[in-house]
């Protein structure tokens, strides 16, 4: 899980979702997991 100021899609499997007011990226590749903070 990377914590970044700006979350971006890295590959075509990445999805940007908002969960409890937190922007996250979920992906089939675990390296692409990100959270805005």
UniProtKB/Swiss-Prot annotation:
It comes from Idiomarina loihiensis (strain ATCC BAA-735 / DSM 15497 / L2-TR). This is Large ribosomal subunit protein bL36. One of its GO terms (biological process) is translation. Belongs to the bacterial ribosomal protein bL36 family. Transmembrane segments: none annotated. Keywords: Ribonucleoprotein, Ribosomal protein. Pfam families: Ribosomal_L36. The gene is rpmJ. PANTHER family: 50S RIBOSOMAL PROTEIN L36, CHLOROPLASTIC, LARGE RIBOSOMAL SUBUNIT PROTEIN BL36C. One of its GO terms (molecular function) is structural constituent of ribosome. GO terms for cellular component: cytoplasm; ribonucleoprotein complex; ribosome. PROSITE patterns: RIBOSOMAL_L36. InterPro entries: Ribosomal_bL36, Ribosomal_bL36_sp.
């Amino acid at each position: 899980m990377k914590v970044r100021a700006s979350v971006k899609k890295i590959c075509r499997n990445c999805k940007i979702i908002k969960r409890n007011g937190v922007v996250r990226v979920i992906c089939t590749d675990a390296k692409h997991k990100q959270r805005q903070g």
